[in-house]
Amino acid sequence: MTGPLSTRVATLCNQIVAEVGPDAAGQVERIGERLGEPLRVAIAGRLKAGKSTLVNALIGRRVAPTAVGECTRVVTRFRYGPADRVDVVRRDGSRRSLPLDDQGMIPQRLGVHLSRVAYVDVTLTSEKLRELTVVDTPGLASTDAGVSARAEAAVGASPVPAGTAPFDADIDADSASEVAAAEAVVYVFTQAVRADDVRALEAFRHTSARLASSPINALGVLAKADTLVGGADDPWPVAGPLAQQQGTLLARTVSDVVPVIGLLAETGEAGRLTSADADALKQLAATGNLQVLLASVDLFRGAPGPVGADRRERLLSLLDLYGIGFAIAQLSAEPRLGTGELVRRLVLASGFPRLQHTLEQTFRWRSDAIKAGWALARLDRLAGHTQDPRTREALRDAVEQLLREPDYHRLRLLDVAQRVATGAVALPADWEQELTRLATSEDARWILRLPDAGPAELADAALRAAHRWRAYAVAGAGPAQSRVAQVAHRGFYLLSQRVRG
């Protein structure tokens, strides 16, 4: 789905193709085409952090292998297509097509030496990929220097001295170009955030010219939340507060930290739990030794009971102990509960819906402005490089005319919000929070913290905020703060006009 800002820029591209020279026309067309592509989300994190499991949940199919293999050592792009297809894209641009394996997953062996692989391009018929392209990156801080190099390249990291970052210093530019187009970044970690986790996130932010690498469009995921406690115990009393602590620690790097039980999310979203699995869980629910059965993985495997060893092993692979305990509790309370409803509750218990909401509502809304700003910057850059005066003037006139439209003030708001969010410009905490709300939402009630206000009250509140920012720009700010405040002033003034109608 293309938003109104990027749609307008795409229309502009179509209009000016006929006004520019032939050399520039192809580039303008490509910029316009890129605006129509789905939101790109790059998934990054340590090896075995749960990235591929999360990718499968986002896609709605178990297609990304979770065991370490060749395909987990390269950048993999998942996008929508009319047929399932796997292409290994070499650095020279050539492709080698592969079928999915017997389990419907990417083959573990790619048939191309890893040093020659730029990325793996996977097209799937999954409906979830119609509006979302997922880019899975290799594990960061790998003990394998080659894998770490590809991970560094995937996040666009600059070379750094050995031992000072979680990457090898070698950079794969082909892989870097794949992730550079992402509108959002999801960084996956487990339990405590380590110093090099923070440095890895900083690599996204400092080496990209795109707003996607700022806290505005970066999200942390505390994966494997069920492993924070033992056995089948409820992890959420621990996972929730821990995610809040991590969010505070990473406030300059990510917009939020969301705890997720990735295995439950993958099992539910990919439709892996069958009626036979549900029947086995019902049999277990009817036994009298649940406390022993769920005390540990070994006891679950070996304790006497009506369900065979193979089925128990499968349940562990689908749900692990917490998921099994949760499912049994649901079935004990409602023995006639259907498989579909059980799956729905498992997904809710995974915490995945909150992550989906953030990606779909927050990142997707922001990505409209991100894409529009990227396209306008590319058009302006093209104007600066062309040798044809007619082309140069046509491009610059079109960009300047569009930027004068009030709707495009959002681009400037996102730009200054990024500077403040990364600490480049310091603002008082409450001012920073207000600016972030203004830059990242269209909901006037949420921006102004007036959930029950009508249009007139909202308009007056927005105007007061505009005056407050104007006064701060004139009297209470340094030069950098003043520039930010001027942008915020105009943003609130435009908001007051919009809500007043």
Where are these regions (language model features)?
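N-terminal J-domain/J-like co-chaperone modules of DnaJ/Hsp40 proteins
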Residues: 409-501
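Charged, amphipathic alpha-helical linker segments immediately N-terminal to NTP-binding catalytic cores
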Residues: 1-22
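Charge-rich, solvent-exposed alpha-helical interaction surfaces
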Residues: 8, 12-15, 27, 358, ...
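Globular "head" domains of long coiled-coil molecular machines
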Residues: 32, 36-294, 349
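Secondary-structure edge/capping motif, primarily at the C-terminal ends of alpha-helices
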Residues: 16, 335, 362, 366, ...
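Active-site-adjacent bridging/hinge elements
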Residues: 50, 326-334, 437, 461-468
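C-terminal end of P-loop GTPase domains and the immediately downstream helical coupling element
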Residues: 213-215, 219, 225-233, 237-411
